[in-house]
């Protein structure tokens, strides 16, 4: 039986592809270099077709519904390699068939249980950062950050389903006025079925891609994530 993991878990999701979820994780790893991060990317695929880009690729396990690999080379340019290059202590890639994520959870749990906590005290929960929306079906992480771009009309069902669980919203385009309500109205106008009521009361941070991490987001995570007791997973 996989061991129970005691960890602070930060999940980064987003409403569509190519809006900088991986880039945000890279920025967060760099912002907290002493966190001894275990980082991971979770990919679901269908019939040999990659969920990222829609083309056939080698991310689909050939014989099994799930596969998990630890990244060992920070220079390959893959997303999991980028996590290592940014300073993560360990980096993994979990792949499952579409709709079969539950079958991959024992592998994920066992991998996190085996990962060391680096220089963290033995009784301190390890710090884990994962890229996924669907993982929220199976856990309530310490923090869930949702990456949004109101000018991108595509909206994943998994992102829509869990938007009300977001602890904070990261916008990839700067609103025309410095006001949280402007961002909320943009979302409501751009995406059918997304109401501003889902976003009410949630912190909003603006970080266009390739710009520095907002300092107020760093403060938010230092207070909300690193002071949290962690969860059992």
Question: What are the language-model segments listed below?
Answer:
Residues 2-7:
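Phosphate-binding P-loop
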Residues 9-14, 38-41:
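Short, hydrophobic/glycine-enriched beta-strand segments
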Residues 11-28:
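Glycine-rich phosphate-binding P-loop
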Residues 26-98:
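N-terminal phosphate/diphosphate-binding loop that engages ATP/GTP or pyrophosphate donors
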Residues 50-53, 104, 140:
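Short, well-ordered secondary-structure micro-motifs
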Residues 112, 116, 217-233:
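Short, hydrophobic alpha-helical segments
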Residues 127, 132-224:
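Conserved catalytic-core segment of NTP-binding enzymes
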């Amino acid at each position: 039986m996989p061991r129970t993991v005691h960890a602070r878990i930060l999940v980064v999701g987003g409403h569509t592809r190519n809006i900088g979820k991986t880039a945000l994780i890279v920025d967060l790893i760099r912002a907290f270099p002493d966190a001894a991060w275990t980082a991971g990317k979770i990919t679901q695929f269908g019939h040999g077709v990659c969920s990222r880009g829609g083309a056939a690729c080698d991310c689909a396990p050939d014989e099994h519904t799930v596969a998990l690999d630890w990244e060992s080379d920070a220079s390959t340019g893959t997303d999991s390699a980028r996590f290592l290059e940014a300073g993560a202590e360990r980096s993994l890639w979990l792949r499952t068939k579409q709709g079969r994520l539950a079958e991959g959870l024992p592998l994920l749990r066992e991998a996190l249980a085996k990962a060391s906590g680096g220089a963290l005290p033995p009784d301190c929960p390890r710090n884990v950062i994962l890229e996924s929306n669907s993982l929220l079906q199976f856990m309530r992480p310490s923090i869930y950050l949702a990456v949004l771009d109101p000018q991108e009309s595509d909206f994943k069902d998994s992102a829509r389903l869990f938007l009300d669980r977001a602890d904070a919203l990261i916008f990839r385009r700067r609103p025309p006025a410095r006001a949280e309500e402007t961002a909320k109205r943009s979302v409501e106008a751009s995406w059918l079925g997304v109401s501003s009521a889902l976003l009410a009361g949630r912190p909003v941070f603006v970080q266009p891609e390739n710009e520095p991490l907002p300092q107020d987001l760093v403060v938010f995570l230092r207070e909300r994530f690193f002071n949290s007791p962690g969860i059992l997973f």
